[in-house]
Amino acid sequence: MTALPSPDRPRILVANDDGIFSPGIKALALALADVGDVVVVAPDVEQSAVGHGITIRRPLRFKHTASAGFGTLPAYRVDGTPADCVVLGVHLLGRPDLVVSGINLGSNLGDDLTHSGTVAAAIEGLALGLPSIAFSQQGNGGGEYSFTAGAAYAARLARAVLAKGLPPRVLLNVNFPAGLPRGVRITKVGEHRWEDSIITRHDPEGREYHWVAGQSRAADAHDPDTDYGAVQAGYVSVTPVRLDLTARDLLGELAGYVPEI
């Protein structure tokens, strides 16, 4: 039987991009159950790297599920994007006090933020006027992830954000290192980027198809002030991210050479 929400406890909406059956979202939701009344709304299949896409050309299915391992926590699966999950969760289940996304299988550092579905779910929460946090876990290189330390820290950080709040239009992007964290660093977004490569093959009928592959690169891998540098050094990276992407330092310079209409 689904536990009823308590009027004395904060409401927490948990989403992700790895899908509702991901071990990361299960670890996060169960840890946050000690903080508030948790409801899970996640994609029914993996939606990694879809960015902040919103589905507007077809209807969406929003279904309760009891088979994803969340125990008494209410959980819903959506045949849409991570941002869709937040939109539907907020509008169909009521406004939460906090939106949390993750824990992602793999880091979201530097330029990853621009295509991360995990971060996009937090951005959608922020766009709806709700404090939001995205959590991601670095892998050990062998395709394995440990969420114990990250989930415990996520609960502590959620308590702090619920108590103190966040500045308007600012979310937190949090990344956990593969091993036991050495500490926590407040960081800036680094220059960690993905260099694409295309693998071209042919199907049995000779028709060409392509895989987008690539390799991550970091221009500032040893800068301790960046998200990438902190995680590589074994620290939890907590990065405040603004929804406003304006390059304010260039406003005056552009006015000097942008032509009039």
Swiss-Prot record:
Disulphide bonds annotated for this chain are: none
Q: How is the cofactor bound?
A: Binds 1 divalent metal cation per subunit.
Q: What is its EC number?
A: 3.1.3.5
Its recorded reaction(s) are: a ribonucleoside 5'-phosphate + H2O = a ribonucleoside + phosphate
Q: Which GO terms describe its cellular component?
A: cytoplasm
Q: Report the gene name.
A: surE
Q: Which family does it belong to?
A: Belongs to the SurE nucleotidase family.
Q: What is its main location?
A: cytoplasm
Instruction: Please name the GO terms that the record assigns under molecular function.
Output: 3'-nucleotidase activity; 5'-nucleotidase activity; exopolyphosphatase activity; metal ion binding; nucleotide binding
> InterPro entries, from UniProt?
SurE, SurE-like_Pase/nucleotidase, SurE-like_sf
NCBIfam families, A to Z? PRK00346.1-4, surE
Q: What class of enzyme is it?
A: hydrolase
What is this protein identified as?
A: 5'-nucleotidase SurE
Q: Where does a divalent metal cation bind?
A: 17-18, 48, 104
Q: Where in the cell is it found?
A: Cytoplasm
* Named cofactor requirement(s): a divalent metal cation
